[in-house]
Amino acid sequence: MIAGQVSKPLLSVRSEMNAELRGEDKAATSDSELNEPLLAPAESNDSEDTPSKLFGARGNTVLPDPGTPDQHQACQTHPTFPVGPQPLLTAQQLASAVAGVMPGGPPALNQPILIPFNMAGQLGGQQGLVLTLPTANLTNIQGLVAAAAAGGIMTLPLQNLQATSSLNSQLQQLQQLQLQQQQQQQQQQQQQQQQQQQPPPPPTSQHPQPASQAPPQSQPTPPHQPPPASQQLPAPPAQLEQATQPQQHQPHSHPQNQTQNQPSPTQQSSSPPQKPSPSPGHSLPSPLTPPNPLQLVNNPLASQAAAAAAAMGSIASSQAFGNALSSLQGVTGQLVTNAQGQIIGTIPLMPNPGPSSQAASGTQGLQVQPITPQLLTNAQGQIIATVIGNQILPVINTQGITLSPIKPGQQLHQSSQTSVGQAGTQGNLLHLAHGQAATSHSPVRQASSSSSSSSSSSALSVGQLVSNPQTAAGEVDGVNLEEIREFAKAFKIRRLSLGLTQTQVGQALSATEGPAYSQSAICRHTILRSHFFLPQEAQENTIASSLTAKLNPGLLYPARFEKLDITPKSAQKIKPVLERWMAEAEARHRAGMQNLTEFIGSEPSKKRKRRTSFTPQALEILNAHFEKNTHPSGQEMTEIAEKLNYDREVVRVWFCNKRQALKNTIKRLKQHEPTSAAPLEPLADSPEENC
């Protein structure tokens, strides 16, 4: 998705473009009418510079005459394109496009505007980005002051932006298309220079055809040089594919055969559904490729979203802010917001050191990639979930254990007065945070280092550290992880060979070593152990220390040792205890099974009471007594028990359970009806009475 504000100077920019193209439209023949836009109104006229003209087709631009090189260099034109979106959008059209999307009616023009790309139709499977401008005046944004000089057009290099893992393959395809565009431009420039030096071929060598179709068949299409942002923006990649299609067939075929067997570029662009482009890049998915216009005619919102998609394609190669992107290199995280725009958490990012495909053209690419898995924190800095791929795993907060918030003083130093750019998807938007809104940034600078500190590693379990290739064969806090893993594997084999269960081991350890080694302690999972995988790179010293300090020390021993769900320090502490106990158990087993049983011992089993089932007649009598008196006396309960032939304890428990069920029902009713009638008499079980 693209969101943002495009100021009113765009109208003047479009007027200048129409003024330059108005003179060439007079030389167009009737064949150029095949390029009328499918998304623009049919009654649109070139003489009217209205905001609706911004969605006109590029087909109205006629290829210049080869004999006029001055005009050819002064105003570069693009080949015909069936979709017809313009890369320039006005604020009024953006507001009308999202009038039915954002709650609360059409948004004001001084507020951030969002255009969802992933909608019904061809745009449903696309993943997009959202750019939100925090202020209406672009000149207030540090590092983007060049927007005023460029006529209020804000362009950012998005070709290398990796907001989520699902965008990586599509963005790589976009980079390949842009690289093909550059190569094709170089070839076109060379051919154009040669044709300017030599006279054009006589028109008698070809079949008679209109003058507007002769230049694209007898000579290559003029190259597409990126003009300044104040005059014209480059064409989307889909246009570049169709522009290079006729030139790929021209050197290998005779002009006469090309005239008979191959339609003109104008005819190819006017009927794409009947004959799709054979370009290999056209069949691959790309988030910036506009959809099929025939499926969007009856959907004006999707049509304008398609125009915004084309605008995003032109933004990808614009050089308007090539020199003002130094401040954008400090992007350190993503802000995750809900559908109402409320910030619910952050995801750390790290710079991507890979080279930019646009380095030759001088555009500086903003290269960032997310850490996988990602640590998600809320506005207070508390860890609330982890993101692995496209799945968000929520944190299951253990009762009695609270997550320690990250203090603002422990964050990375940020540059003051930096704008907040947002990038998102449908449902929950992912925002690129590089400013004051990121009060819960995670340490991405520590993420780039090869190893973290010992305190952050100690917050992870042995199993997580062993699975990490960076720390699998190393030591953490002086503990050999490989040794711990081998001991846990051998301990399980030795336990099974003795025919012992984990319950028996826990009972024996609890009797000899204390309750910290009981079965309940061994089976208990410490917070953020088995439920989540917190990346070592995303851990911070303060997070690890604060979490460890707030946890009960008794919880650090356990976590099941055999599953390596235990911290290295705890594993190092419990290892000699288990080794000593297992050696003695094996010695008892060799002496005889009876000695092993005596050594293990057995706690007296607590026999569960049989559940009482009441007959319908008994339930009817009990309910009748409960309606009369919810707290019967001891003598009354004895009489009821004798009448129903039940134990008095069974009757007493039934009344206690019935009173508790009634209190729960009253509590639920009060939640649904806050302004209820006079409150009922509170029901309480007094220990002095019957319970």
Curated annotation (Swiss-Prot):
Biased composition (Polar residues): 437-447
Claim: Ligase is one of the keywords in the record: no
Biased composition (Low complexity): 188-197, 206-216, 238-272, 448-458
InterPro entries: HD, Homeodomain-like_sf, Lambda_DNA-bd_dom_sf, POU, POU_dom, POU_domain_TF
Pfam family, one: Pou
Record region (Disordered): 1-61, 188-297, 435-461, 670-691
Subcellular location: Nucleus
Domain of life: Eukaryota
Expression tissues: Expressed in kidney, heart, muscle, spleen and ovary, but not in lung.
Keywords: DNA-binding, Homeobox, Nucleus, Transcription, Transcription regulation
Principal subcellular localization: nucleus
Keyword tRNA processing part of the UniProt annotation: no
UniProt DNA-binding residue ranges: 607-666
Cellular component GO terms held in the UniProt record: nucleus
Residue ranges of domain POU-specific in the record: 476-586
Biased composition (Pro residues): 217-237
Compositional bias annotation for Basic and acidic residues: 17-28
A GO molecular-function descriptor: DNA-binding transcription factor activity
Annotated family: Belongs to the POU transcription factor family. Class-6 subfamily.
Stated role: Probable transcription factor likely to be involved in early steps in the differentiation of amacrine and ganglion cells. Recognizes and binds to the DNA sequence 5'-ATGCAAAT-3'.
Record-given protein name: POU domain, class 6, transcription factor 2
Organism, scientific name: Mus musculus
Gene expressing this chain: Pou6f2
